[in-house]
Amino acid sequence: MIMKELIESIAKHLVDKPDEVNVADVETEQRIIYELTVGDGDYGKIIGKGGRNISAIRTIIFAINAKQGGKRARLDVID
């Protein structure tokens, strides 16, 4: 499973409108930026209380990326 699909799968399980979840990736020389967009009202569910959900998702992404030895990864949630 590629990283983009993993992010999308996790996000779809957290939101009320899974059909509106979209992940785009922007690659630069030094990093890959994943841009997650969700439907209206679902932004808070992705962020979670005190940022716990987004922090956990980012930790998983960083850990997998470090193990694979790829470019640095960043996850942005677009509202």
Give, region by region, the residue ranges found by the protein language model.
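RNA-contacting regions in translation and RNA-metabolism proteins
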Residues: M1-K45, N53-D79
